[in-house]
Amino acid sequence: MDLEAAHGAAAAPGKRRRRARESWGASLLLAYQSLGVVYGDVATSPLYVYKSAFAGDDIQHSAGNEEIYGVLSFVFWTLTLISLVKYVLIVLRADDGGEGGTFALYSLICRHVRAGLLPGGAGDELAVGGRRDARAMSRLRAMLERYRVLQRLLLLFALLGTCMVIGDGVLTPAVSVYSAVSGLELSMEHEHHKYVQLPVTCAILIGLFALQHYGTHRVGFIFAPIVCVWLLCISAIGVYNIVHWNHHVYRALSPYYMYQFLKKTQTGGWMSLGGILLCVTGSEAMYADLGHFSQSSIKIAFMSVVYPALVLAYMGQAAYISQHHSFENAYHIGFYVSVPEKLRWPVLVIAILAAVVGSQAVITGTFSIIKQCSSLSCFPGVKIVHTSSTVHGQIYIPEINWILMILCLAVTLGFRNTKHLANAQGLAVITVMLVTTCLMSLVIVLCWNKSIFLALGFLIFFGTIEVLYFSASLVKFHEGAWVPITLSFIFMIVMCVWHYGTIKKYEFDFQNKVSVNWLLNLGPSLGIVRVRGIGLIHTELVSGIPAIFSHFVTNLPAFHQVLVFLCVKSVPVPHVQPEERFLVGRIGPKEYRLYRVIVRYGYRDVQKDDIEFEKDLVSSIAEFIRSGDSHHNGVLEDTDKSCEKLSSISNGIPLWMEDGEVDASASPHKETDTQIISPNRKKARFVLPKNAQVDSEVRRELQELMDAREAGMSFILGHSYMKAKSGSSFIKRIVINFFYEFLRRNSRGPSYAATIPHASTLEVGMVYQV
């Protein structure tokens, strides 16, 4: 035994080392893959940063090189402080169940503080450990929980950041592709170039958006190599320019040159900051795409590959420009002029490919954030297509895709130059960063339980830097910065109107729900004819009987033998574990055959198709019946208060299919003697554990459930028409009767309802006076 123990002790370090090597190997693989998904945008920023900073008459390149050295110093420290320190070292730690982004920060705060305005929220907040500086935190928490106006401001702030991300999804493809194609300017005659650049840019953009429905997984394997080649290319050119033109350019990394730059250029230098801040565009993607990778992989990729390559690229451009002062045209202050002439065509091709990769990442991120907003009732329902069977985050939204394409082409054709496009993108980028800084300061106090002074230090330090850039971008309102403001205003109106209407609809349902006593007093037959089958009544309520049901049975007194009130909720967490997805309860005595099922999805979860959903639903109800709910699971104990107990069903009773496959791991199970055959379905049986003690009453209820499933399942969907009640204000009538109704008529229904067979669906119309 001693020898075995000694051998085990000696082997343990070897196992730990092997696991560590495997972990590092997985992180390195993810880091490599993240180059193509996360860093395409920030990697292409050298194409237009210097060109945007020197655009117009804000600053001029002089023989003393104060301007170019000052711009390089600002670029270096902005990239270091914002991208490296703020995002990589701090913000990446604030993940919401592994997910990132502006809305993830908002949902994280709402779960720790009861500050959510979303109907049918997630319930109690998560337990938080530690109470450091509890007095200051409790005061801040109490204010957010007590004052409804602060909750609304918090939601509006999160929506502002979301709208600017959508605006960035419009502007980034235009800026990146247009800047990449601008390399043709130095490779062909000017007379030919002016007829080529715009059509080529538009053709690439149309092709980019037209191919979205194929999904990034089909060409994703080449994304990382393209970005790797691009980063290697710009860093090698940077090293060449530093060695060949000005190897003392590293001195410009000193903050002293920022002071000299502002001292000499004054107002012009401050206004040029709007172009300099584009060096950090794409930094938000590191946080937004956190769900697809890990913190360690994103940190490894940025700190070891992306950051050094970008610094070398910016230093190389500055080294070349510092030795060339006789530029005839402004476009010479840019990327391609610093590329050796023999390499311009290959670099041009790589740049265009890298710009497409960067644009793809932003477009996919826009799809993801709109899906999050739609899941949390902050955006009208849209069609969501999952383009990958393995990576759930890869989605495609047709309506949003074509809207983005039209807007992207509109700004490209409207501005026709990098200056105005860059001004527009700069304001969108810095606004999102400001929102992230403010929300992050709340996370530090409320979620991490750190000192409020630490949060204030974070807010003041990074907020001051970003406010400086924000002010420089805002003064360019008439030179392109009005575009993201206009786009965000339009999307903000859409989101606020939809959210307001959704809340009013939920409040109407809640206030007009029917008492459970009314239903129980009808008797086991509910006072109506009970026909074979399962009836699913969709409701937003987690308790009580929806008014739509009483409206239905009053006009058509017949219903199914098994009645299920189905509530599908999106909760403010990224993912809900399968064993926690279904909550099942019983309404009234067993002979009524009334059940309530609440199905919970996270804002990043993928909802199943109708066959899988129906199968899981019936299996969960069957497991609820088998588990002996009459004692403690889901019995309606206090009908006056409509207090129902719901049970979380971890694993439903699996179904044995006709071809011999079992839907769950059920090898040690035996089947009941219940068997059904349906012309439209495979025959199925419940599979019970071998040691299960099933009495005759439970077996009879399971038999009835399977008979009802054999007869068919019908979905009753409420089709509500919102009308502002008499006496409402003029603004409310406009918002509800026109704006909200317009959005409702042109939006998709619930995502699970889209997969329900039309022959099994019945819509019941009802007017809501709100």
From Swiss-Prot:
| Bilayer topology term | Multi-pass membrane protein
Annotated localization: Membrane
Recorded hits in InterPro entries, A to Z, give: K+_transporter, K_trans_C, K_trans_N
Specify whether GTP-binding is a keyword of the entry.
Answer: no
Pfam families from the UniProt entry: K_trans (PF02705), K_trans_C (PF22776)
Membrane-crossing residue ranges in chain numbering: 24-44, 71-91, 153-173, 195-215, 219-239, 268-288, 300-320, 347-367, 395-415, 426-446, 452-472, 480-500
Q: Which residues lie on this side of the membrane: Extracellular?
A: 45-70, 174-194, 240-267, 321-346, 416-425, 473-479
Cytoplasmic side, ranges? 1-23, 92-152, 216-218, 289-299, 368-394, 447-451, 501-770
| CC terms in the record's Gene Ontology section | membrane
Q: What is its main location?
A: membrane
GO molecular function annotations of the record: potassium ion transmembrane transporter activity
- What's any GO biological process attached to this entry? potassium ion transport
Keywords of this entry:
Ion transport, Membrane, Potassium, Potassium transport, Transmembrane, Transmembrane helix, Transport
The UniProt similarity line reads: Belongs to the HAK/KUP transporter (TC 2.A.72.3) family.
Summarizing the function annotation, the protein's role is:
High-affinity potassium transporter.
Q: What is this protein called?
A: Potassium transporter 25
Which organism is this entry from?
Oryza sativa subsp. japonica
